[in-house]
Amino acid sequence: MNREGEWTVRNSRLDRILYIQQILVQGGVLNKQQTADHFGVSEKTIQRDLDTLRSYFADSEPRREILYNSAKGGYLLDDTLSRF
């Protein structure tokens, strides 16, 4: 992030994963194509990043899951199980 709190585009895997995690944790919807365009990478690269985050959540926060929502056109973090 820069001083104004905006994400600057960097193209490391860690930067992408942190960017994706931030969007999802804040309740946003992640569009794979837009994210790929933003970072100048392929959708497959973003899919691998999502898979990495899925593994992270499965190990550290099993009540949270990254799901695709076709109505919203992207991926979101489902934490409905954490409400029980």
Stretch-by-stretch model annotation:
Residues 1-84:
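Short, basic/aromatic recognition patches that contact phosphate-bearing ligands
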